[in-house]
């Protein structure tokens, strides 16, 4: 169900939830919210749990770091509660963000922003073109590096020298990216693209029952988390 939600509706609901969670400083509200997001992801979403665990690991380490530093260097009056609140808040926000990332297709998200939230087509198509260029830039990076190795350019062993040597790779990549962007702009203008907001779409992103059910589910979780913070 979460995978079938309109990306704009999902984005608005997640943004509202994050803003609302920012006003609660007790540890129970973010903890209940985090557990609820994981439960929603388990029952109503299709994600790769292995990838989710790997992506969640840095946030988990960050939450542990927040807990430790606040516990050691915080005010003695409310050290434990503040430490738990900060660490659980990191987990709640990160799990909600990953839920959006793993259940939303980037192209559908941009199309939905244009159709539902009236994002400027100039900005939207610029983002789409940049997104499509990412695999091309990756291939060009390896091609340029292999070409330099064939010409006898050695890869430095020192991490600092390796970073400074990246400029020999980045300059050709940036030059190629500028040429591709210019050709893409000329091609879009030749096909009649003007950037006007009033336009027809071949692929329409609609709002349906899954959006109502998913929004209601997120609102119930948000209200339940707030109630848990008040009662516990």
Model-derived segments and spans:
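Alpha-helical transmembrane segments and their membrane-interface exit regions
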Residues: 36-46, 61-67
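Juxtamembrane/interface alpha-helical elements of multi-pass membrane proteins
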Residues: 55-160
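Membrane-helix interfacial "entry" motifs
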Residues: 2-3, 43-51, 74-82, 203, ...
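Short, aromatic-rich membrane-interface segments at the entry and exit
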Residues: 26-34, 50-55, 79-80
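Transmembrane alpha-helix interface motif
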Residues: 1-27, 33-40, 143-232
């Amino acid at each position: 169900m979460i995978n079938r939600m309109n990306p704009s509706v999902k984005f608005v609901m997640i943004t509202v939830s994050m803003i609302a969670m920012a006003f609660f400083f007790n540890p129970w509200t973010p903890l209940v919210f985090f557990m609820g997001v994981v439960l929603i992801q388990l029952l109503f979403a299709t994600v790769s749990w292995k990838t989710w665990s790997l992506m969640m690991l840095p946030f988990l380490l960050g939450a542990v770091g927040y807990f430790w530093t606040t516990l050691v260097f915080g005010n003695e009056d409310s050290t434990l509660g503040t430490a738990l609140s900060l660490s659980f808040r990191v987990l709640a926000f990160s799990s909600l963000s990953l839920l959006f990332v793993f259940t939303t297709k980037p192209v559908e998200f941009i199309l939905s922003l244009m159709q539902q939230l009236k994002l400027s087509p100039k900005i939207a198509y610029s983002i789409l073109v940049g997104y499509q260029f990412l695999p091309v830039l990756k291939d060009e990076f390896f091609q340029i590096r292999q070409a330099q190795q064939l010409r006898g350019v050695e890869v430095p062993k020192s991490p600092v020298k390796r970073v400074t040597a990246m400029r020999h790779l980045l300059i050709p990549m940036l030059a190629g990216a500028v040429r591709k962007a210019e050709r893409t702009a000329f091609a879009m203008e030749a096909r009649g693209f003007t950037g006007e907001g009033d336009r027809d779409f071949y692929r329409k992103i609609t709002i349906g029952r899954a959006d109502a059910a998913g929004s209601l589910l997120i609102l119930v979780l948000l209200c339940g988390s707030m109630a848990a913070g008040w009662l516990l």
